[in-house]
Amino acid sequence: MPRVDKSLMHEWIEAVARGFGKSLGDISYIFCNDAKILEVNRQFLNHDYFTDVITFDYSRPHRISGDIFISLDTVASNAEMVGATYEREFYRVFIHGILHLCGVNDKGPGEREIMERYEDESLDILTNMIARKK
Protein backbone atom coordinates (compact mmCIF):
# COMPACT_ATOMS: atom_id res chain seq x y z
CA MET A 1 0.00 0.00 0.00
CA PRO A 2 1.45 3.41 -0.84
CA ARG A 3 2.32 5.80 1.92
CA VAL A 4 -0.86 7.82 2.48
CA ASP A 5 -0.99 11.44 3.66
CA LYS A 6 -4.22 11.27 5.66
CA SER A 7 -4.87 15.02 5.65
CA LEU A 8 -4.32 15.19 1.88
CA MET A 9 -6.62 12.21 1.35
CA HIS A 10 -9.31 13.84 3.49
CA GLU A 11 -8.96 17.09 1.54
CA TRP A 12 -9.17 15.16 -1.74
CA ILE A 13 -12.23 13.14 -0.74
CA GLU A 14 -13.89 16.32 0.51
CA ALA A 15 -13.20 18.11 -2.80
CA VAL A 16 -14.58 15.23 -4.86
CA ALA A 17 -17.71 14.93 -2.69
CA ARG A 18 -18.23 18.70 -2.79
CA GLY A 19 -18.27 18.48 -6.59
CA PHE A 20 -21.41 16.34 -6.22
CA GLY A 21 -22.96 18.69 -3.66
CA LYS A 22 -22.11 16.32 -0.79
CA SER A 23 -20.37 16.66 2.55
CA LEU A 24 -18.45 13.95 4.40
CA GLY A 25 -19.91 11.73 7.07
CA ASP A 26 -18.27 8.63 8.51
CA ILE A 27 -16.29 6.69 5.94
CA SER A 28 -14.31 3.57 6.81
CA TYR A 29 -11.75 1.98 4.52
CA ILE A 30 -10.97 -1.68 5.08
CA PHE A 31 -7.83 -2.78 3.24
CA CYS A 32 -7.78 -6.53 2.76
CA ASN A 33 -6.60 -9.40 0.58
CA ASP A 34 -8.44 -11.29 -2.17
CA ALA A 35 -9.67 -14.01 0.20
CA LYS A 36 -11.39 -11.46 2.45
CA ILE A 37 -13.00 -9.48 -0.36
CA LEU A 38 -14.27 -12.73 -1.92
CA GLU A 39 -15.79 -13.65 1.45
CA VAL A 40 -17.49 -10.23 1.71
CA ASN A 41 -18.66 -10.43 -1.91
CA ARG A 42 -20.21 -13.86 -1.33
CA GLN A 43 -21.72 -13.07 2.07
CA PHE A 44 -23.30 -9.70 1.35
CA LEU A 45 -23.72 -9.50 -2.43
CA ASN A 46 -24.06 -13.18 -3.42
CA HIS A 47 -21.27 -12.71 -5.98
CA ASP A 48 -18.74 -15.51 -6.33
CA TYR A 49 -15.79 -13.58 -7.73
CA PHE A 50 -12.88 -11.37 -6.74
CA THR A 51 -13.19 -7.61 -7.08
CA ASP A 52 -11.07 -4.60 -6.27
CA VAL A 53 -13.61 -2.60 -4.24
CA ILE A 54 -16.93 -3.14 -2.48
CA THR A 55 -18.84 -0.14 -1.16
CA PHE A 56 -21.55 -0.28 1.48
CA ASP A 57 -23.47 2.97 1.28
CA TYR A 58 -25.02 4.49 4.43
CA SER A 59 -25.28 8.00 2.99
CA ARG A 60 -28.00 10.55 3.55
CA PRO A 61 -29.10 12.85 0.73
CA HIS A 62 -26.30 15.42 1.10
CA ARG A 63 -23.84 13.59 3.36
CA ILE A 64 -21.85 10.54 2.28
CA SER A 65 -21.08 7.71 4.69
CA GLY A 66 -20.10 4.11 4.16
CA ASP A 67 -17.71 1.21 4.48
CA ILE A 68 -15.34 0.64 1.58
CA PHE A 69 -13.45 -2.66 1.26
CA ILE A 70 -10.39 -2.62 -1.01
CA SER A 71 -8.46 -5.74 -2.01
CA LEU A 72 -4.81 -4.71 -2.22
CA ASP A 73 -4.11 -7.98 -4.07
CA THR A 74 -6.55 -7.06 -6.83
CA VAL A 75 -5.24 -3.49 -6.94
CA ALA A 76 -1.77 -4.95 -7.66
CA SER A 77 -3.01 -7.33 -10.36
CA ASN A 78 -5.17 -4.58 -11.95
CA ALA A 79 -2.16 -2.24 -12.09
CA GLU A 80 -0.09 -4.88 -13.82
CA MET A 81 -2.91 -5.76 -16.24
CA VAL A 82 -3.55 -2.15 -17.35
CA GLY A 83 0.09 -1.03 -17.22
CA ALA A 84 -0.46 1.50 -14.44
CA THR A 85 1.66 2.07 -11.36
CA TYR A 86 0.44 0.42 -8.18
CA GLU A 87 0.06 3.86 -6.60
CA ARG A 88 -2.13 5.22 -9.41
CA GLU A 89 -4.35 2.12 -9.38
CA PHE A 90 -4.62 2.31 -5.58
CA TYR A 91 -5.85 5.91 -5.74
CA ARG A 92 -8.23 5.07 -8.60
CA VAL A 93 -9.83 2.27 -6.59
CA PHE A 94 -9.78 4.42 -3.44
CA ILE A 95 -11.80 7.19 -5.10
CA HIS A 96 -14.02 4.68 -6.95
CA GLY A 97 -15.64 3.84 -3.61
CA ILE A 98 -16.22 7.52 -2.85
CA LEU A 99 -17.78 8.02 -6.27
CA HIS A 100 -20.23 5.22 -5.52
CA LEU A 101 -21.16 7.02 -2.28
CA CYS A 102 -21.71 10.18 -4.36
CA GLY A 103 -24.21 8.30 -6.53
CA VAL A 104 -22.08 7.27 -9.51
CA ASN A 105 -22.87 3.75 -10.76
CA ASP A 106 -20.91 1.51 -13.11
CA LYS A 107 -23.08 -1.52 -13.88
CA GLY A 108 -25.65 -0.22 -16.39
CA PRO A 109 -25.23 0.67 -20.06
CA GLY A 110 -22.79 3.56 -20.46
CA GLU A 111 -22.23 3.88 -16.71
CA ARG A 112 -18.72 2.37 -16.76
CA GLU A 113 -17.51 5.15 -19.08
CA ILE A 114 -19.06 7.81 -16.84
CA MET A 115 -17.39 6.26 -13.78
CA GLU A 116 -14.03 6.20 -15.56
CA ARG A 117 -14.40 9.87 -16.51
CA TYR A 118 -15.10 10.80 -12.88
CA GLU A 119 -12.17 8.64 -11.73
CA ASP A 120 -9.85 10.46 -14.15
CA GLU A 121 -11.17 13.88 -13.08
CA SER A 122 -10.73 12.92 -9.43
CA LEU A 123 -7.18 11.71 -10.02
CA ASP A 124 -6.44 15.05 -11.72
CA ILE A 125 -7.69 16.84 -8.60
CA LEU A 126 -5.32 14.75 -6.46
CA THR A 127 -2.39 15.39 -8.82
CA ASN A 128 -3.02 19.15 -8.62
CA MET A 129 -3.26 19.03 -4.81
CA ILE A 130 0.05 17.17 -4.59
CA ALA A 131 1.71 19.67 -6.96
CA ARG A 132 0.49 22.61 -4.85
CA LYS A 133 1.95 21.08 -1.69
CA LYS A 134 5.45 20.79 -3.20
Predicted regions and their residues:
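An acidic/histidine-cluster motif and surrounding catalytic segment
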Residues: 1-91, 102-134
